[in-house]
Amino acid sequence: MSRIRETFASLKRAGRGGFIPFITAGDPDIATTERLLIELAAVGADIIEVGVPFSDPVADGETIQRASERALLKGVTVADILACVARAKQHIDVPIMLFSYFNPLLSFGTDRLANDAKEAGVDAILVTDLIPEEADTWTETLIQFDLDPIFLVAPTTSDERLKQIAQQARGFVYAVSRAGVTGARDEMTEDAEVLVKRVRSVSDLPVALGFGISTAEQIQHVWKFAEAAVIGSAIVREIEKLAASPDLINRVGEFARSLLERTQIRRAGRGAKRQRSVNSKL
């Protein structure tokens, strides 16, 4: 069983939903990304999603687009990101998932990427613009290196494609709460719950719901019908607001912690004391 599946199995035994924060690697810089990984693990993240910056992030809203632009202006590369994950993983045990467009990974080399990602401690990779009909070789490569291939499904995903994704995915299925790009929203539609039911009809994999989740109330709502909630733009927006602050790490950590505390589920991260002592030295 992969570490991603072990995490979901542990959540099921504990009777609680998963909390998956997203950050863009290299925003505002790669050293801060390393410290944020440690901090988010300390406050209670179950899995951390790390975005690979790309120059044409068509699936992302303005907040994450700006984060990608800032990271690219700093010259952040795939190699930098993997090295960052490797350093952070010396101090944390939370599974890490890369969220990327295919172009940066192709440029790096898919076999090399899978090998280096595994060595760095990455547990799963989601390629947002790779359709399942063209993903056989990619999926086989990831599985060869014990990495979980993660796929997106949306309310507009056809039943046929949903079945293909169910056959190829490992770890969990990433369900998009609504059609469109990433970004925080005030309200969620019924489409999300309907989509999760459709996934369950063809797969026994856990389902994480993302895109548009930004409040504790929304997280609680998602946990009623999905195994985990992904919080992206809301956290990236906090990083953007605090980019010039020397207290960025603590304040982003407090923001993430506040979301969890307001769900009335308090929990320490894995090795939280150790992670905090490490972060204070970085």
Task: Report each predicted region and the residues it spans.
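Glycine-rich phosphate-binding active-site loops on the catalytic face of alpha/beta enzymes
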Residues: 47-55, 124-126, 131, 175-183, ...
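Catalytic beta/alpha-barrel core
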Residues: 73-76, 122-134, 148-157, 182-185
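N-terminal amphipathic alpha-helix/helix-capping segment at the start of soluble metabolic enzymes
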Residues: 1-20, 85-89, 267
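Alpha/beta catalytic cores of nucleotide-metabolism and tRNA/nucleoside-modifying enzymes
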Residues: 81, 197-205, 214-224, 228-282
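Catalytic cores of alpha/beta
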Residues: 30-38, 157-166, 209, 213-229
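Hydrophobic faces of well-ordered beta-strands that scaffold small-molecule active sites
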Residues: 19-23, 48-50, 96-100, 125-127, ...
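Alpha-helix-loop-beta-strand connector modules within alpha/beta enzyme cores
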Residues: 61-97, 140-150, 154, 190-207, ...
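Glycine/Thr-rich beta-alpha phosphate-binding loop at enzyme active sites
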Residues: 64, 74, 152, 162-201, ...
